[in-house]
Amino acid sequence: MQLSRSTLSRLAIAALTVGLMLAAAGGTASAASIRRVWMTGYAAPGTPARLDTVGVIKIGSTKAKNVLVIEPGTSGGGAYFVPLAKWLVAKAPGWQVWAVERRENRLERQGELDKFKKGEVTAQQFFRYYLGYLTEPDSEPHYKPVSESKATEDGARNWGMNVAVQDLHVVIGAAKALGGKVVLGGHSLGGTVVTAYATWDFAGKLGAEGLSGLVFIDGGSSPVPATAAEAEAALEKLSKKSPWLAFGGVPAPLLGLFSMTGSALANLAPKDASLAQGWPPLPSFLRPHDKEGAEVPATNEATFGYGVNVGSSPPNLAAAQVHAGEGIVEAGPGEPWTWNGTGALTPLQRYAEMLSGAGLKGVDGSEWYYPERLTIDSAAVGNGITNPAQAVLGEDAVHGGELPTSLHILAINSELDTMFGEGFNTLKFAEGLAEQSAIPSGNVTLVDVRSSYAHNDPNGAYPNNEFVSHLVPFLEGL
């Protein structure tokens, strides 16, 4: 049954919420209230009602009326933003941060991760449950991935921009119901979703109506959309394969499991000899090597750092990178190599907390199953201007020249802009979006850190962070 938009709006305000108080991991804002809720979302065609939900991790005082809603990027989960959010609400106590958990995160089975976080299973048991079993002959209980046939049956091939935007509309409606200001932000592909939402046609009203600001964290929408032929070809190809994106060439759910297990082991068993390194299927590019190119034994922390740090992380994982320090260093004789975080922008342990959901129950910062349809659809947003590809894909991001002139925009880039050239330029995308609607230049803040920040440094850098130093006054000035 399809729910009307008015029904969805009412559901957003009086949402079917399952509130779970989540333990706040230590740090500068450990007193911040953190809770997760699931709301009834958009009734997507072909999707069972149990999956027509959208999650939110809410950080900050329940008395705060202003809300920054943040949409994750490709293969990102809501917990990724929690360390940043705790810091923000400590600096701007009149605000809450709501980190979106897209519907596909309902497919994850986090029970064993929760046990590991509570110390109820060993590191070896935890790793074996999610990955190690793949090379072991015994039949002990282990993680069972969602089958391609089941995902297809549940409509996952249709979880594109329309589904993401309609689910987000529920979240925005709930945030507006608090009576304060609402700002929508997004990281990476989440920035494309921000543009799509702001310019979307909701029964004649554009999504930006009632929003005070937009925040683009190294992401946005190119003004040059895909062609109709390209959109048709992408849909045809998707119809014959898994609904899930193989991000960086690594199929689902393996990339998400690599991220989750690697970060959790780095966080909870950092000095132990690497479990992943002893697992035969681990790709060579994720195995620590010395400067001469020889593989070296390393700790869990060092193995995780090697895979995400600029300088050792491979180009196909640029979207996972941070500046986490100098890298792996040799320890004593017979000891595994360890991590040297000297000079880090994003401390490696902080990044491990972001990706593993440290101290939180039932969530992590990685998305194990990410629908490829959302990436296909993102190419047609075209900064919110009508184009033939949108018609092919069923998108309504058409009000790109009609945004309120009162809207404020903040955008920050990273080294990805230099890697991908003019085809990917966060600041130009944001500036162009503002110019289309004659938003005054004084309302637009552009932060250029492409010479120093990796893709995840804006969200992870601590205690010095160019993004935070601009975001806090941006929010408080609205």
Regions found by a protein language model. Give the residues of each.
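Short, surface-exposed "cap/lid" segments of acyl-processing enzymes
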Residues: 60-132
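C-terminal subdomain of alpha/beta-hydrolase-fold enzymes, centered on the catalytic histidine
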Residues: 101, 294-478
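Gly/Ala-rich beta-loop-alpha elbow adjacent to hydrolase catalytic centers
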Residues: 185-190, 194
